[in-house]
Amino acid sequence: MREAGRGGSPVLVLHGGPGPAGVAPLVEHLASDHRVVAPTHPGWDGTVRPGDLDSVPALAAAHLGLLGRLGLRDVTVIGTSFGGWVATQTALDDREGRISRLVLVDAIGPVIPGQRITVPTGPPAPASQGGPSAQAMAALRAYAGPTMADADLLPRLSTVTCPVLVLWGVDDTVVTPDFGRAYAAAFPHARFELVPGAGHQPIREKPETVFTRLDSFLTPRTSATGH
């Protein structure tokens, strides 16, 4: 787990397939105004995934446990790609009201009619191109299952009443902007924004645009409704 920053409201950053390196620029940016907690999902970067940690709900429970151990409340959770699915599940399962805002960046998770998740079938892309390692892909499959989606997720999103920002690369071919629009529309209080010139990894491809959108969403903070 990485922690950065000392003041301001807490932010939990959940990485996607490429691992912690994929969100490192975001962590650095947020650390100037926030306390940032960026855990490594077990199974990435040489970490061991326990056998009973084999689903997205189990991983979300682990991250909620981390927030509890750290005593954090009024938490903004940010997740990208697979991390967005975990972030969504974390918000759904937050029985103690620790989470006040949710940010999804080109997130996967729900089954959306007429849309699909296009997972590359060739060898993993090199890390220099933001690709996940073979170990990361194995962990991803263990958590996400063969379909990389949860058929029961979409109708449950109406219960997440905190403010939600959904950012999407306009050129994403893994999960298209139409997927993102439908994802956002399932939340009661979400806004959807496209990131021009970006594909599935806007944090790597257009970091300044992402940071500007995030800063606008997070500052000034307004009261959240909770759930």
Language model regions located:
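Catalytic active-site module of serine/aspartate enzymes centered on a nucleophile-bearing elbow/loop
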Residues: 190-191, 197-227
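Short beta-strand/loop motif that positions the catalytic acidic residue
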Residues: 160, 166-168
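Acidic catalytic loop of the alpha/beta-hydrolase fold
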Residues: 171-175
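Conserved HGGG/HGGXW glycine-rich cap/lid loop of the alpha/beta-hydrolase fold
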Residues: 2-48
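Hydrophobic, aromatic-rich cap/lid helix
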Residues: 125-155, 159
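Flexible "cap/lid" loop of the alpha/beta hydrolase fold
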Residues: 85-93, 98-128
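Active-site loop/oxyanion-hole signature of alpha/beta-hydrolase fold enzymes
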Residues: 37-78, 204, 212-215
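Short alpha-helix in the alpha/beta-hydrolase fold that links the catalytic acid
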Residues: 26, 176-185
